[in-house]
């Protein structure tokens, strides 16, 4: 159903943002009628973003639209942390479950996942930011804070994300790419 959107975004060379929207009404377990303890937001959202990324890759969308750019919320969600599990899991599915998703792609699945862009909205979690940086590189990271969703109307997340980026062991040029350069390039703001 999103193919027309992908066509237009590819034509205009503009990114598609992916943000999770899982609500409290989606239970964590089948025996329940809703998610409890804010689990849907804390962990359901990263799962939902990851599931969207998996579907975009294995459905062939990224082959059909080779120049399309997707910006994922929460620094690529679970993909950077579980990237090796993703590789091994697909190898296992192909060898033992006779899955054919991987064979239908033009390149190794992990290469598609590295094509995504990742925002820095990790609430200032330096270790998670380093994991995202290790997977995507500075060239595929864009500044984001999750403003205004914190207990200080957005100021806390903004302050913590800036602090986390400034504490990264990266060059000033890479820091500038993350803070503004990549977004300016992706959105054609300098034209």
Model-based region annotation:
Residues 59-60, 68, 117-118, 122-142, ...:
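Mid-to-C-terminal alpha-helical segments outside catalytic/metal-binding sites
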Residues 1-142:
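Catalytic pocket-lining loop regions of alpha/beta-barrel enzymes
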């Amino acid at each position: 159903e999103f193919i027309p959107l992908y066509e237009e975004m590819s034509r205009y060379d503009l990114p598609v943002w992916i943000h999770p929207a899982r609500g409290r009404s989606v239970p964590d377990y089948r025996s329940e009628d809703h998610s409890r303890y804010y689990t849907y937001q804390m962990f359901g959202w990263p799962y939902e973003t990851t599931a969207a990324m998996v579907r975009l890759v294995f459905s062939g969308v990224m082959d059909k639209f080779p120049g399309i750019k997707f910006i994922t919320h929460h620094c690529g969600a679970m993909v950077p942390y579980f990237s090796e599990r993703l590789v091994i899991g697909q190898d296992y599915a192909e060898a033992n479950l006779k899955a054919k998703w991987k064979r239908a792609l033009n390149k190794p699945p992990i290469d598609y996942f590295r094509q995504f862009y990742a925002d820095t909205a990790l609430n200032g979690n330096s270790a998670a930011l380093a994991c995202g940086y290790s997977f995507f590189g500075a060239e595929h990271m864009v500044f984001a804070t999750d403003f205004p969703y914190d207990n200080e109307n957005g100021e806390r997340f903004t302050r913590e994300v800036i602090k986390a980026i400034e504490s990264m062991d990266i060059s000033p040029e890479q820091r500038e790419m993350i803070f503004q350069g990549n977004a300016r390039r992706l959105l054609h703001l300098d034209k």
